[in-house]
Structure formats: structure tokens, C-alpha cells
Amino acid sequence: MKKITAYEIALSGLAAALSTSLLVLGTVTPILLFTAYLVACVALMLPLSRGSYAGYVFAFLTTGLLTLLFCGFSFLFELLPFLIFFGLHPLVNELQIKYKWKKWLAFFIKALWFDGAMYVTWRFAFGMTTVVALPEVAVVVLLLTLGTALFWLYDYTVFKARAQINALVGRLLRKK
């Protein structure tokens, strides 16, 4: 097993702190919640930029736990999309690159995962709390069409952000 360096520990701590701060802000300011998911996802890429999978897992688990502790466990449904998809997506992208998975196959699997995560979120978070009753088939069709199209844009953006994060961390660590 590879030894974790001080830089990787620092990047993991920074990723956890940034992600937690963003998710707490998004949770208490509902209009910023989706933006908080996205930016927290980018912040979690910091340990992955140095190839630290253990640091990433630490940052992800710490982010989820601290956000629930700071906001209260009653906000679990607001954090559900982050916990079941957005927080884990950078790791899956990194594994896709490391093991050279076919792009179309990886996209198909990740799109189904995204659609499933959004369906679970709709069932638990919105389906139980909204007064408007949407037909089940309409929600599934909407998720499979619009959700997959939005996921394509999101996945493309996350891959571009990954390249920028890797370049930024590489420059910062070379400046010793």
C-alpha cells in the first residue's frame, strides 16, 4: 500500500473543509443547494489530483458526516443527492480514466446511476413532501430524457474541471 504524504493529507482536509462549508451554505440557503453540490464535487477532486483514493474517501465521508452534524440530521433528504451521486461521481470518473473504460459504456452506466439517484431523491425527498401528485410514468420519462441530457452536460463539465484541478494542484506543489 502506498504511503500517504503530507500533501495528500492536507488536500484531503482542505477538500473536506471546503465541501462541508459549501454544503452547509447550500443547505441553509436552498436556492444555492444544487450549486453547492456541484462546487463541493469539484472540491472533492483535490485528493484525487494526487491519486489519493484513501484521501478522497476520507474527505467524502467527513463531508457527509460534518454536514449532517452542522445542519442536523433532519436535512438528510437535502443531502441525499450528494451522498448517493454527486459526492461519489469524481471517484468513478477517476476510476474510468485509470482503468480505461470505454467512454460510451461508462457514460451509459453513469447516466443510469444519475437517473436512479434522482429518482430515489424524488421518491424520498419530493414525493413525500409535495402536494402535487405527478404520475410515476411521467417522472420516469422526464428523468430518462431530460435527466440524461443534463447529466451529459454535467459529466463533460466535471471532466474539464478535473483537468483544471489537476493542473492547479500540480503547479502549486511544484512551487515549493
Identify the residue ranges that each predicted region occupies.
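Hydrophobic transmembrane alpha-helices
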Residues: 2-50, 54-58
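Alpha-helical transmembrane segments and their cytosolic interface
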Residues: 5, 137-176
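Hydrophobic alpha-helical transmembrane segments
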Residues: 9-13, 35, 57-61, 79-80, ...
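Aromatic-anchored segments of alpha-helical transmembrane domains
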Residues: 19-24, 64-70, 112-120
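Alpha-helical membrane segments and adjacent membrane-interface helices in multi-pass membrane proteins
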Residues: 33-92
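Short helix-perturbing small/polar motifs within transmembrane alpha-helices
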Residues: 82-119
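Mid-bilayer segments of alpha-helical transmembrane spans in multi-pass integral membrane proteins
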Residues: 111-127, 148-156
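Membrane-interface helix termini and inter-helical loops of multi-pass transporters
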Residues: 125-138
